[in-house]
């Protein structure tokens, strides 16, 4: 299996993160699976929907490129899943998203989930995302730390910064647990990977879910099932396949000119 892992960070600005991610992906996938990390430049450095929109467009183009280069699946390694539905409507290979995969799998581990994101400006986005996935009754709370995406990358080169992130995450997670949350999800691949060093990571018995290996395993499963059954996403509604000329137009006119 050959998988394209789409990070919303580029190597130039996230070298320590990419290096750690490379190791973690290799630990998470089957021995016969190859995962190639690809970035976005300029990277997602500021928490805002406009940045998500820009990065989503590039991700969709990259999903088309991945399919044309013979990849078996794409993983959107960005918890906000920006561009997910549009990418699925543009390609026939599986597109697995970090946020969706983590939330869906976590519903098998706990009845009530909580998310701790890195920045308060992401909270509205997450609520829209939760509603879109039909999980409003299961993901019952979203709290936030106070980092920009670019700032939290510094934790990969500083033990002091990493400890600061861990403490802030616990401070935001504990009130959710007190309110009845059964499991906590770090709202981003960057904090997920940062916390992956903690085996059976819990806060007051509530598991802290690392979604990166979940997304990898879901991608491998999607590839295997597609090979066995021939089935992919439904083309009747949200994922109706765009005509080829529309896809080519999208690729050729990034500014709509």
Residue ranges: model-predicted function:
Residues 208-228:
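Short, flexible loop segments at boundaries between secondary-structure elements
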Residues 60-109:
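Glycine/small-residue-rich loop that forms an oxyanion/phosphate-binding "nest" at active or ligand-binding sites
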Residues 49-65, 163-171:
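Glycine-rich, highly charged phosphate/nucleotide-binding loops
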Residues 6, 68-78, 180-189:
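Periplasmic-binding protein-like
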Residues 1-54, 121-159:
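N-terminal glycine-rich anion-binding loop in soluble enzyme alpha/beta folds
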Residues 16, 108-145, 222-257:
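Short, glycine-/small-residue-rich phosphate/pyrophosphate-handling segment
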Residues 132-189, 196:
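Active-site rim beta-loop-alpha module in soluble metabolic enzymes
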Residues 84-96, 194-214:
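Short acidic, glycine/proline-enriched helix-loop-strand junctions
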């Amino acid at each position: 299996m050959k998988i394209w892992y789409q990070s919303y960070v580029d190597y130039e600005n996230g070298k320590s993160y990419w290096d750690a991610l490379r190791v973690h992906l290799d630990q998470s996938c089957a021995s016969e699976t190859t995962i190639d990390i690809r970035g976005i430049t300029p990277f997602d450095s500021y928490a805002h929907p406009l940045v998500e929109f820009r990065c989503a467009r590039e991700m969709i183009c990259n999903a088309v490129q991945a399919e044309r280069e013979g990849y078996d699946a794409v993983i959107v390694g960005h918890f906000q899943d920006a561009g997910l539905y549009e990418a699925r409507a543009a390609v026939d290979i599986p597109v697995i998203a970090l946020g969706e995969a983590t939330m869906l799998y976590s519903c098998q581990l706990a009845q009530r989930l909580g998310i701790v994101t890195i920045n308060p400006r992401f909270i509205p986005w997450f609520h829209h995302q939760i509603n879109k996935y039909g999980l409003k009754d299961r993901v019952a709370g979203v709290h936030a730390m106070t980092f920009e995406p670019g700032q939290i990358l510094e934790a990969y080169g500083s033990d002091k910064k990493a400890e600061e992130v861990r403490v802030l995450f616990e401070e935001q997670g504990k009130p959710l647990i007190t309110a009845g949350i059964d499991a906590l999800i770090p709202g981003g691949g960057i904090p997920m990977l940062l916390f992956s060093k903690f085996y059976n990571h819990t806060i007051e018995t509530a598991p802290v879910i690392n979604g990166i290996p979940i997304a990898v395993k879901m991608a491998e499963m999607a590839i295997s099932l597609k090979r066995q059954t021939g089935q992919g996403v439904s083309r009747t509604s949200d994922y109706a396949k765009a005509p080829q000329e529309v896809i080519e137009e999208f690729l050729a006119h990034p500014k709509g000119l």
